[in-house]
């Protein structure tokens, strides 16, 4: 809401409670606007599709990307906890399913006022990921946290409708990141980091880049070619994301994930440990390890 308010203050027209049903295509197949679920049609010189992981614009265009399939599953709940408010992210690496070390982690993220965000996430390169009941796994994780925190049970959280779960696309699931008339950003682009799942910063950065590239292209040539956006994204994140996709596949092997956990457990410095866990961030000095991960950051 803060970002929407800021955009509105700067002159953007904000349509609250409005959903896009799909794109408007011209006779040549170029995206020339959007159709709202209400049936209203809005024409546009260029569309920035930041319409989420299940992007109706991307689905309507039948986009095929060489990077499709990279994703994480995340589940979390906000709740009261009898623990001190601290300004740090607790990361728990021991996540197991039927004896296998999962390629993921759990987190406890303080919200202030005696409330916490507790959740977990794991990537879908693990061969049994579809067999995992994420709600049950979260319940087991909660049960393993200190009893003196007096946390609610998973059943109580479900009854209160406090549990949220989602599949997070990552590693650029729309590539190239544009088609004539449209540029993809955020989860519609699959902008989350393919190893850690950090998504908020990349959503904002890709949206900014898409806007700037759209303006530049419209000024210099028109909406049929946004190659400048491909170049911008590739220059900024291409090397990091290629490395991250390789890492995503690698940690899906339980023995490799377990070896990684043992290595991290041997690191006594919490700051270094966090940087090793969210290892992509060594190349991104603007990102704090405390803001990373599919839970608090996405």
Report each predicted region and the residues it spans:
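Conserved N-terminal/central alpha/beta ligand/cofactor-binding core
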Residues: 1-19, 271-280, 285
């Amino acid at each position: 809401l803060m970002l929407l308010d800021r955009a509105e203050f700067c002159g953007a027209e904000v349509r609250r409670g409005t959903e896009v049903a799909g794109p408007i295509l011209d006779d040549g197949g170029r995206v020339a606007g959007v159709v709202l679920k209400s049936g209203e049609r809005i024409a546009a010189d260029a569309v920035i599709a930041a319409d989420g992981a299940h992007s109706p614009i991307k689905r309507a265009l039948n986009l095929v990307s060489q990077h499709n399939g990279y994703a994480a599953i995340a589940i979390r709940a906000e709740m009261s906890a009898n623990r001190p408010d601290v300004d740090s992210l607790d990361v728990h690496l021991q996540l197991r399913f039927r004896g296998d070390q999962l390629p993921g982690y759990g987190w406890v993220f303080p919200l202030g006022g005696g409330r916490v965000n507790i959740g977990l996430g794991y990537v879908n390169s693990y061969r049994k990921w579809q067999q995992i009941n994420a709600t049950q796994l979260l319940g087991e994780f909660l049960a393993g946290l200190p009893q003196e925190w007096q946390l609610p049970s998973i059943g109580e959280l479900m009854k209160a409708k406090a549990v949220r779960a989602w599949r997070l696309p990552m590693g650029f699931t729309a590539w190239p990141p544009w088609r004539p008339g449209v540029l993809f950003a955020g989860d519609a682009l699959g902008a989350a980091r393919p190893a850690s799942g950090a998504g908020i910063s990349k959503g904002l950065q890709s949206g900014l880049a898409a806007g700037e590239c759209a303006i530049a292209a419209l000024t210099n040539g028109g909406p049929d070619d946004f190659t400048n956006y491909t170049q911008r994204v590739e220059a900024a994140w291409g090397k990091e994301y290629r490395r991250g996709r390789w890492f995503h596949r690698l940690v899906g092997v339980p023995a490799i994930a377990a070896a990684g956990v043992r290595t991290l457990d041997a690191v006594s410095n919490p700051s270094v440990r966090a940087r090793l866990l969210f290892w992509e961030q060594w190349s991104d000095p603007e990102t704090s390890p405390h803001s990373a991960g599919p839970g608090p950051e996405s």
